[in-house]
């Protein structure tokens, strides 16, 4: 179980997440740092309860999560072949990045000109440069910071493109011995889909409050735990940008 605060130009949304053997349950508990109204709370619980009442909806959710995880894994697996790396010294791990106080190896990366992406998923790597921070002792990726230095097409340019200047950051931290979790994900991209529809992704999500729970919970059991978690704690977050909802 963990908490995520996602911030976009429209404001912030706080969720409590719980991963189950069926799918990940995420319950909204605050907008712009303010707890939900009774009406919003009932609507949010009803949104999740539809997965409990409709097995087909839950199956689709699980399939989408699996597809997203596979896409991410393909990108990670491609990194050693897609990039050329150069030693850029060391940094010290801090809160949210690696293990606090422990050294991290910094490597700059740029595209490998001989790399041929096997699918449109990996195409974005051909126009990206940046750096990674590695825990060389535990063989863990603590951070990756990448920027598109040129426009990059995906689907070989047929499906669309991402504009030059797109930027992303992912931080990982050790939350307990040999257990690492993503602590921050920041995305800033613009482009076009099918050369017609504008694409704009601007978001930062911070994750905290990691607690270990049973991995054998059902989605229905997770929903009940999330309701209790929401009731037991008062959300105390800096107010985000006002948003119309």
Predicted segments with their positions:
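Structured extracytoplasmic
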Residues: 1-129, 137-142, 147-166, 174-176, ...
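Beta-strand elements of repeat-based all-beta scaffolds
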Residues: 171, 182-184
